[in-house]
Amino acid sequence: MSAARKRVAVVGVGTMGSQAAWRLAARGAEVVGYDRFAPGHDRSAAGGETRIFRSAHFEDSRYVPLLKHADALWEQLQQETGRELRRLTGCLLMGPTEHQQMATVLQSIAEHDLDHEVLDAEALAKRFPQYRIEDGDAAVLDRRAGFIRPELTIQTAARRAEQLGAVIHRYTTVREIVPVANGVEIRTDAGSECFDTAVVTPGPWVNDLLPDLPWDVEIRRLVSAWFVPTTPDAWFGEERPAFIRTAPTHCYGLPSPDGISVKLGLSRALHRIAGDPNQLDRTVQPQELEIFSELIGRHMPDLHPDPTRLSVYMEGYTESSRPLVGPLPGADNVVLLAGFSGHGFKLSPAFGDIAADLALDGTSEQPIDFISTVGRTEA
């Protein structure tokens, strides 16, 4: 069956679903999307104005080819829509020279010939004085990196899909996905529709929608906090890279596009279990701010320790931190993308393209064999 004749449902038009809808529609599929809210909402993982894009990968260098594919698609989506969805300002990875993540990022840079610069502690302190450097620290500046605008990206990808013929049902919760003869049935409160295939990108609602999923996706609650610097020029000058610190406490941050504040976030280990995604606790308790105060005092003393803004989001994590990507067992026409474990947004155009491959062709030429693909267990 050709893409032009294939009818594909996209369940969840968020980070992954909006990209999948765009790539499917671009290939001529008849696309119908469903979202319990509307593209660009802040009820799950996408929000907070910025996400980091980087080319060097400190978790696993095998992601780099996917990042390169995503990079090309970011450029393509911007060109097709005329919107600035990301800005390449660089990204600093800082930490002890002996830390494993520093070794892995240098490995990924060497293997894939990535544009970068290595800074020792002296050079780092001189060039980026806003960071307090510890003995033994070094940094890698990933030049093909910067920030993404998440809400704008999702809305832009969804609108581009609609321009290409997709239909998106907003504020429409999918209650059930039922494989049927030669297709799949999507059931909502408004009724049901049948499709040839479905791409399921439910975000933190994965366990609600697929309660019998044989793999664990743990939904965690994460806090983003914004702080105003005392010396704005240090953060918002000619160089204003995003940053990641590996140790002793893993954290990340981005100078905000408005030139006023700096956003900080924490690693998975410091995120609470979210519980029911429909009842997310969005109140940030004072004790949750203590770790931010400690980080600022130790590594970024130029930031005022009282946050000017706090936001709470949800993210799905797998045990391996690798996503679930592929057809569900016993339902080859239902393609799942879930559990991106905090690393999905920068890769979302690539995974949207992979979802289109799997939905239309049943396979993808992209190098995803190392991922914990649905239907098998990664050794």
Regions found by a protein language model. Give the residues of each.
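N-terminal Rossmann-like FAD-binding beta1-loop-alpha1 element of flavoenzymes
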Residues: 7-33
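Conserved Rossmann-like nucleotide-cofactor binding loop
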Residues: 16, 39, 205
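Active-site substrate-recognition segment that forms the wall
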Residues: 22-26, 84-86, 192, 197, ...
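Glycine-rich FAD pyrophosphate-binding loop
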Residues: 26-46
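Dinucleotide-binding Rossmann-like beta1-alpha1 core, especially the glycine-rich loop
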Residues: 50-127, 250
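Flavin (FAD/FMN) cofactor-binding and adjacent substrate-gating region
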Residues: 96-164, 169-170, 176-179
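Predominantly flavin-linked oxidoreductase catalytic cores and closely associated redox partners
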Residues: 148-233
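C-terminal catalytic lobe of FAD-dependent flavoproteins
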Residues: 294, 298-379
